[in-house]
């Protein structure tokens, strides 16, 4: 199994590199995901109205198995920082893991630097609001309610505490775009958010937010590998049906 796993990784890496090269000649077209359309609208309204976005990366530390959603959120954060640098209120980031908080501060600084607005950067906008699930949520709720937030982007590792964040967003009439990998969090998000990101759509955040060609190429590579797996399964079923070992 380890050899098969290594082969899959190498094939995926090769596909991604090849697609990055091909993307220079043609821009890929992805299906529309309503949550990302809503996010783009929220970004524009934030700049026009002089309000701020709230991005929450969850509480998946980098040394835990649940680190991937937070990294996906960081990839999107860089682009959001650049796009909202003209707003009167800089976006604010919350997280429930110390390493994620540090990375969010670094990502904010890099985003403002890329937008030639480094003077806007304030390390206090990358906040560690709590180290346990509900202390993390309790620290983020006052921010949603009291800091002129017009939209919330919740992309990371969440548990049942995500319901507190989406409830606070609803009470302040600030829309939320949310995604998580925990089944309980997914159920709560689906019930409480108008446009949830379902399943693997969470990991498409970087590609859909314009974070770079590598993110778009990786999304295309996932689609190709998915079709390869489907064809292998169908081929195996056909061989089994006709009694071919």
Where are these regions (language model features)?
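C-terminal functional extensions of proteins
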Residues: 184, 192-245
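Membrane-cytosol interface motif
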Residues: 31-52
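Hydrophobic alpha-helical transmembrane segments of small proteolipidic membrane proteins, enriched
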Residues: 1-33, 239-243
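Membrane-proximal low-complexity regions enriched in glycine and acidic/polar residues
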Residues: 115-171
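Long, charge-dense
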Residues: 83-85, 89-137
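Extracytoplasmic/lumenal ectodomains and periplasmic regions of secretory and membrane proteins
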Residues: 150-200
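Histidine-anchored nucleotide/phosphate-binding helix
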Residues: 67-88
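Gly/Ser/Thr-rich loops at beta-strand to alpha-helix junctions
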Residues: 58-74, 97-101, 156-162
């Amino acid at each position: 199994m380890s050899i098969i796993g290594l082969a899959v990784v190498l094939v995926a890496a090769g596909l991604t590199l090849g697609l990055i090269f091909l993307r220079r000649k043609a821009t890929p077209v992805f299906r529309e995901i309503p949550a990302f359309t809503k996010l783009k609208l929220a970004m524009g309204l934030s700049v026009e109205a002089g309000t701020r976005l709230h991005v929450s990366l969850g509480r998946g530390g980098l040394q835990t198995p649940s680190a991937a959603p937070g990294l996906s959120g960081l990839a999107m954060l860089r682009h959001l920082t650049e796009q909202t640098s003209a707003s009167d209120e800089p976006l604010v980031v919350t997280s429930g893991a110390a390493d994620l908080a540090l990375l969010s501060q670094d990502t904010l600084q890099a985003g403002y630097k890329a937008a030639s607005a480094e003077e806007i950067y304030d390390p206090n906008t990358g906040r560690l609001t709590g180290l346990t699930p509900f202390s993390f949520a309790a620290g983020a709720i006052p921010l949603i309610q009291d800091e002129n937030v017009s939209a919330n982007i919740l992309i990371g590792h969440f548990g049942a505490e995500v319901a507190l964040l989406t409830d606070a967003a609803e009470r302040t009439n600030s829309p939320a775009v949310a995604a998580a990998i925990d089944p309980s969090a997914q159920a709560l998000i689906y019930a409480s958010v108008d446009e949830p990101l379902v399943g693997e759509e969470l990991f498409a955040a970087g590609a859909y937010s314009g974070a770079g060609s590598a993110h778009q190429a990786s999304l295309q590579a996932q689609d190709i590998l998915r079709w390869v797996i489907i064809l292998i399964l169908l081929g195996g079923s056909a061989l089994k049906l006709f009694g071919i070992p």
